[in-house]
């Protein structure tokens, strides 16, 4: 009986070894590349325990979400463009808070942080309009060579940080060592699994002249697991384990320990059959299909002079729009304000932002969740008519609502 048990265990062991070897060597050689995709949602979620000079402050929970739209090459980009480069226009917004007891951070109408960038075939990301996001640039990136499980490569990337939320972003170069693990399935999608490690090193010769002048140095370690879409080359999931310390010239040291997670999601498809007909019946509402989604332009919208306060009667139009938007249960709405050109660029920018937020608040007051609105102001930078006539200026004073998809 003992001899029989031994034989069974021996053959079971041999089978397991054979299965393992076959599984490893059956993995095909692969070529990683960024092929681009249509519109997508990028989410960066951090859960970091913060310590100031060794004293525990709390769990810093932060979520940065964005709606990113594929776009044509911007007119401002003239040289150094590869035909395979992909260009994107992003609207980022931040939800942040400090938790000690797991309480949920309150949310509401979001202010857009605009961003424009391009991504090369190897995953290198170059900023065109930089307001601090995305915070990981050129990560992950891919080699030109064919890869087998266990193969390694190194590549530089940039991480944009603002540890104290001062509104001053410091860009830190990082040298990342990648390892290709295997091909696998994730939620029904073919993906590549990659691991990555790098060290945070800042200070001395590594210095960002445009960054936080109070930041003296930074050091730490990162270890990440990455799932990359085989179809698009997008990193659909990154889970980064972090331990890093930022030192300031005033003697303050801030340490963060925890995780940073990145997700790629895709916006819901909007069923336009139920909304195009009622929209066509609304007065002074122009409906247009754009790369971001269906855009509603509220024409001749009347505000008090130099104010975000609507004139009496305008709320009736907004109520009719809200009735339609309520029938779109999952989509986000981008509300973008525009002004005529009066020569006061900064004033126009502020006024356009305030008017966008005023419209979003009015729509939210009808029962649409406030956290579905992203507000953006473009001042007088996007005219649709000449500002040399009263009629043209009236057309330029408008608010656009895009149903993002």
Regions found by a protein language model. Give the residues of each.
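Signature of exported/secreted
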Residues: 27-284, 288
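Periplasmic peptidoglycan-binding/tethering modules of Gram-negative envelope proteins
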Residues: 249, 260-332
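Bacterial N-terminal signal peptides
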Residues: 9-19
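Bacterial N-terminal signal peptides that target proteins for export
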Residues: 1-11
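Stable alpha-helical elements in mature extracytoplasmic
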Residues: 109, 146-149, 314-317, 321, ...
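Sec/Tat signal peptide C-region and signal peptidase I cleavage site
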Residues: 20-26
């Amino acid at each position: 009986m003992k001899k029989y048990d031994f034989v069974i265990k021996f053959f079971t062991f041999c089978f397991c070894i054979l299965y393992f070897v076959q599984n490893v060597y059956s993995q095909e050689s692969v070529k990683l590349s960024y092929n681009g995709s249509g519109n997508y949602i990028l989410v960066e979620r951090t859960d970091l325990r913060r310590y100031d000079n060794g004293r525990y402050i709390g769990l810093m929970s932060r979520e940065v979400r964005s709606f990113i739209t594929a776009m044509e090459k911007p007119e401002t980009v003239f040289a150094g463009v590869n035909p395979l480069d992909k260009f994107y226009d992003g609207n980022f917004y931040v939800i942040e808070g400090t938790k000690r007891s797991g309480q949920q951070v309150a949310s509401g109408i979001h202010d857009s942080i605009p961003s424009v960038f391009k991504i090369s075939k190897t995953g290198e990301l170059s900023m065109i309009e930089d307001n601090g996001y995305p915070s990981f640039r050129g990560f992950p990136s891919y080699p030109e060579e064919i890869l087998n499980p266990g193969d390694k490569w190194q590549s530089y990337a940039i991480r944009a940080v603002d540890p104290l939320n001062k509104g001053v972003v410091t860009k830190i170069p990082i040298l990342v060592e990648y390892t290709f693990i295997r091909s696998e399935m994730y939620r029904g999608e073919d993906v590549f699994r990659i691991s990555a490690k790098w060290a945070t090193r800042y200070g001395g010769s590594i210095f960002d002249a445009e960054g936080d002048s109070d930041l003296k140095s930074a050091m730490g370690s990162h270890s990440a697991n990455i799932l990359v879409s085989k179809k698009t080359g997008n990193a659909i999931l990154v889970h980064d384990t972090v331990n890093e310390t930022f030192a300031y010239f005033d003697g303050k040291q801030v340490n963060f320990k925890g995780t940073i997670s990145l997700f790629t999601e895709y916006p819901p498809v909007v069923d336009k059959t139920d909304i195009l007909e009622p929209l066509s019946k609304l007065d002074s509402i122009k409906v247009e299909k754009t790369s971001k989604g269906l855009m509603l332009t509220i024409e001749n919208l009347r505000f008090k002079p130099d104010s975000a306060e609507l004139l009496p009667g305008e709320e009736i139009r907004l109520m009719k729009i809200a009735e339609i938007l309520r029938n779109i249960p999952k989509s986000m709405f981008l509300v973008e304000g525009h002004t005529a050109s009066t020569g006061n660029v900064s004033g126009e920018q502020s006024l356009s932002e305030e008017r966008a937020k005023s419209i979003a608040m009015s729509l939210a007051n009808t029962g649409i969740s406030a956290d579905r609105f992203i507000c953006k102001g473009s001042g007088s930078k996007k005219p649709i008519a000449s500002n040399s006539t009263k009629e043209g200026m009236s057309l330029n004073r408008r608010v656009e609502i895009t149903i993002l998809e």
